[in-house]
Amino acid sequence: MKKLLWVLILLLLPLTALAEDAESRRDGAFFYQIADGEAILTGCDWDAMQADSLYMFAEPPVSLEIPATLGGYPVTSIGGGVFCSLDGCPVDAPFEVVLPEGLRTLDAYTFTECFYATKITLPASLEIIPEGCFDRVPAEIDFPIGNPRYSCENGFLINNTTQTLLYTAPSSHGIALPAVRRLGDWSLSNYYLWYDDYDPVLPDTLESVGSYVFYDCGVTRVTFPDGITELSPFTFSCTALQEVHLPASLREIPDYCFWDCHLTALTIPDGVTRIGAQAFNGF
């Protein structure tokens, strides 16, 4: 009986450790969780941070530096929505964010709708920057040269491994899009967010386009180059859109591809073999 009890205790110990790791902890104004001996930043107490004299009396834009360690654990990941303006992130006052060296991973929604960020400094240690990470963020990106996976030039943040455009900073407006193979989810949301009168010239190298690339913008006409084989659900959600030229290379128009678009006419290429559910909702 005692032997069985010890076996059960030993089996439950890892579960107890996992439960403790999953608990939210706090270090100053920062909330975090522990996984494999490393800290994941999960949130900030913005009220406490703004009450701190260091921030209260600083001239905008305030510089917010994320610590390299929390509770003695190295910060290697930042979760989703941490800097979202809709979740309490400082509003009505511009601020800059400096992420620490040693950070390896950002979440797909880390900076979603962080409307008042003016500059984000990324560390050279970053290994994972997912699509959609900087959805509708009007910030410039400061990223060291030499990262083997990512680069940022002329305001364009690119995954060099997959040749995917991840982000377009405000300074990129008016500059030709880089020769990439894919426009990632939300990658052009800032390209048009403040400039609704700009119709894009897409690179000839383009093969696929992610979701929400043309979202809630004033773009009226889009011409896709030959070589495009893939669009995504919600690639378009743009009531101003009037004209789209699809290439002969396209094979499918996925579900919800032209969501809430008021096109007057559209020619479907002969090579398209599937049109998804509600692909032209609002047509």
Predicted segments — roles?
Residues 6-19:
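Hydrophobic h-region of N-terminal signal peptides that target proteins for export
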Residues 36-38, 58-76, 88-105, 114-128, ...:
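Structural signature of tandem-repeat unit edges
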Residues 56, 82-87:
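Acidic, Ser/Thr
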Residues 20-55, 153-156, 160:
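Short beta-strand/loop segment at the start of cytosolic alpha/beta domains
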Residues 13, 57-58, 133-135, 236-237, ...:
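Alpha-helix C-terminal capping segments
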Residues 1-5:
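Positively charged n-region of N-terminal signal peptides that target proteins for export
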Residues 80-82, 108-110, 131-133, 186-187, ...:
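Consensus positions within tandem repeat domains that build extended binding/scaffold surfaces
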